[in-house]
Curated annotation (Swiss-Prot):
Disruption phenotype: Eliminates approximately 70% of aspercryptin production. InterPro entries: Aminotrans_IV, Aminotransferase-like, B_amino_transII, BCAT-like_C, BCAT-like_N, BCAT_family. It is an enzyme of class 2 (transferase). This is Aminotransferase atnJ. The lineage of its organism: Eukaryota, Fungi, Dikarya, Ascomycota, Pezizomycotina. The modification N6-(pyridoxal phosphate)lysine is found at K180. PANTHER family: AMINO ACID AMINOTRANSFERASE, BRANCHED-CHAIN-AMINO-ACID AMINOTRANSFERASE 3, CHLOROPLASTIC-RELATED. Its cofactor is pyridoxal 5'-phosphate. It comes from the Eukaryota. Pyridoxal 5'-phosphate binds at R79, E216. Pathway: Secondary metabolite biosynthesis. The gene is atnJ.
Amino acid sequence: MSTFPAEPRSDIVNGHVESDFNYQTGTWSEPVFVQDHYLKVHGLAPGLNYGQQVFEGMKAYRDPNGQIQIFRPTDHALRMQRSCDAVSIPSIPESLFWASVNLAVAKNSEFVPPHASEAAMYIRPLAFGSGGWMPVAAGPQYKFVVYALPFCAYHGTLPVDAVVLEELDRAAPLGVGNVKVGGNYAPVLKWSDKARKEGFGITLHLDSKTRGEIDEFSTSGFVGIKYTESGGEKGYTLVVPNSQCIIKSVTSTSVVEVARSLGWRVEVRPIPYDELEFFDEVLAVGTAAMITSIRSITHRSKDQVFRYKTSDEPGSACEKLSRHLKGIQKGDEKDTFGWLKRVEEVTV
């Protein structure tokens, strides 16, 4: 008799999960597991033609007992609902979201990396207008899918150099920069590819209205760290932007809560561009990026380069936050926040 979860394997995943929206009943279908890597989609689907699509990114880890835990699924479900509302996709109930994510991971459980590995299983929920529909209006057919695959940190583990992206505004003040839609990412690809060829691992966005405040990195949230000292002991102040044009990052929120639990001071507020020179560390944080140290930030038109207290190794704040956050995610530290949800076996 086989055991659940299955032991890790080294080949590709088994398939994905699908659910379809029934416009006559106004409900989503029960999720089904499809043993295929491809979707059958109408060529005139609004998701392909008009960008009517939203997505999420989340992770599953094996704990020390071999069980599989998913990190903060409720937060991702709620964020996906906000994204759906922004582009007129029917809301995906939290119960359906969890059932679909659980099914996708359970049916691919042998591909969740071992506990001792630095890798995890990346989970990609995606929803889009799927039927043939020519009008520039919300159509009647939608599809919700969940993919999963083994994954390592997007930017690696070493500090990276960043550059301010001046050629493109990521989001307008009353736009959709605060939700996860593909249109926020595709226009950046050209510039991030160019930046990588020039030696910059990541691009940073300033606010589009004044270009005087920090918004976020193209792939992740921005966190600034200032060192403090009291009684001969080093302390930390963590500063994160509260711009209305940025994604509500689940990882950034988690970092803030971990920092507070460690007794660090936390400031959530607008961050002026001119404050960059006063940070001791800068971090890029996100589900795919994890917590990445920023070695430097370059602003070309101003001929400025801000260098931080990191060279070939992450700074002390980055190391502490990464250790505690990863410890919770992998079950090595007690989950006092209630962030983890265990994947249950699916027999059908």
